[in-house]
Curated annotation (Swiss-Prot):
Compartments it resides in: Cytoplasm
Protein name: UDP-N-acetylglucosamine 1-carboxyvinyltransferase
Signal peptide as annotated in the record: none
Listed pathway(s): Cell wall biogenesis; peptidoglycan biosynthesis
Residue positions where 2-(S-cysteinyl)pyruvic acid O-phosphothioketal is found in the record: 115
HAMAP family according to UniProt: MurA
Domain of life: Bacteria
Binding residues for phosphoenolpyruvate: 22-23
Family: Belongs to the EPSP synthase family. MurA subfamily.
Principal cellular location given in the protein's record: cytoplasm
Gene (UniProt): murA
Native source organism of the sequence: Desulfovibrio desulfuricans (strain ATCC 27774 / DSM 6949 / MB)
């Protein structure tokens, strides 16, 4: 098992290329089950979850090749089972449920794993697919789904759900008739999936709004499609510029999709501007100013940036408040930040942060993907040496993060524990 050793206190300066979005790439890879012809997907990040997904697609009967950020997927005779050994490490694996039912009318998918940040149930996925004609049972930890032919339906989600929207969107493109999805997730990654499906011949309208309409087609065809840039990785690097008092130019940065994050970072004293196709971020206030954040579905402040902005709050002047309204148990990074000298008090879904003058390097342990990023940010700003352990979480969502940060002045090395 690896750890990152970080020597803090160095302002980061230079440029970073933002990778393709993991959260967009994963559903697009599963959607590649749907066409009967080969598809090519570009700008795919080199991440553990990506390779786990490709291994799962191979088990399901696809031929997959990954090289230099490009994936070519050739569909074969599909098999229905997504085994536990692959699914246990990654929640997104449940996204093969809709495509398998649409293509072959059956699926046997192990209940998924992934980050341990509270209950993220799949009940809305199943309820929607049942309205389209599927039936389900749970046996020995597997969701077993069957259908003759999915048919269009008018489905309203109880609450916006990214995974549920994506699963039903993929199922509906090959369903018979029209499907209307209401109260859907607005996240850009959902829009990217819809755009990929349209590139393959799907008939979809309304993506990016609360109501998506799909007219089922009999088949999808080949396409080449670039994955959108990763807004959470970009937000993390913006935060890195702020917490170290540096200046970073991010290339391939999704500025519009980061509006809620950029507004908060500006309120803390950062200057963030568009520079052509890039975004320039620098810290203008020393120290940063405290702010309040409430996580919300897009276009609100993303829960996947909550841990990172909390790291900045730890060194900001005055008090800050974080309200986590999306997931429970997503404050597990708090105790680790406190080991470094942060002053944080948690009450239910709210964390109150009082800024301190300095953080001190310490051994810390990552509990999930974004908590890992928070601890790396804290380590970059801390005095002394920080060891971030259990970084396999980090490798699930950040492409070569230590190489990118070292290229702009950080002092990070990967070691075996």
């Amino acid at each position: 098992m690896d750890k990152l050793v970080i020597e803090g206190g160095v302002p980061l300066t230079g440029s970073i290329e933002v990778s393709g979005s993991k959260n967009a790439a994963l559903p697009i890879l599963f959607a590649a089950i749907l066409p009967e012809e080969p598809v090519t997907i570009t700008n795919v990040p080199d991440l553990r979850d990506i390779h786990t997904t490709l291994n799962l697609l191979k088990v399901l009967g696809c031929d997959c090749q990954y090289e230099n950020g490009q994936v070519r997927i050739v569909p074969g005779s599909l098999l229905p089972e997504a085994p536990y050994d692959l699914v246990r490490t990654m929640r997104a694996s449940v996204l093969c449920l809709g495509p398998l039912l649409a293509r072959i009318g059956q699926a046997r998918v192990a209940l998924p794993g992934g980050c341990a940040i509270g209950a993220r149930p799949v009940d809305q996925h199943l309820k929607g697919l049942e309205q389209m004609g599927a039936s389900f049972q749970l046996e020995e930890g597997y969701i077993i789904g069957r259908c003759r032919k999915l048919t269009g339906a008018h489905i309203t989600f109880d609450m916006p759900t990214v995974g549920g929207t994506e699963n039903l969107l993929m199922a509906a493109v090959l369903a018979e008739g029209k499907t209307v999805l209401e109260n859907v997730a607005l996240e850009p990654e959902v829009v990217d999936l819809a755009n990929f499906l349209c590139a393959c011949g799907a008939r979809i309208s309304g993506q990016g709004t609360s109501c998506i309409r799909i007219e089922g087609v009999t088949s999808l065809h080949q396409a080449t499609y670039p994955v959108m840039p990763d807004r959470i990785e970009a937000g993390t690097f913006l935060a890195a510029a702020g917490i170290t008092g540096g200046e970073l130019l991010l290339h391939n940065c999704p500025y519009d999709e980061l509006e809620s994050v950029i507004l908060k970072l500006r309120s803390m004293g950062m200057e963030i501007t568009q520079q052509g196709s890039g975004v320039l971020a620098r810290c203008c206030a020393a120290p940063l100013r405290g702010t309040d954040v409430k996580t919300q579905p897009y276009p609100g402040f993303p829960t996947d940036m909550q841990a990172q902005i909390m790291a900045l709050m730890c060194l900001a002047q005055g008090a800050s408040v974080v309200e986590e309204s999306i997931f429970e148990n997503r404050f597990m990074h708090v105790l680790e930040l406190m080991r470094m000298g942060a002053q944080i008090k948690v009450s239910g879904h709210t964390a109150m942060v009082r800024g301190v003058q300095k953080l001190t390097g310490a051994p810390v342990m990552a509990s999930d993907l974004r908590a890992s990023a928070s601890l790396v940010l804290a380590g970059l700003a801390a005095q002394g040496v920080t060891e971030v352990r259990r970084i396999y979480h980090l490798d699930r969502g950040y492409e070569h993060i230590e190489h990118k940060l070292n290229a702009v002045g950080a002092r990070i090395r990967r070691e075996k524990q």
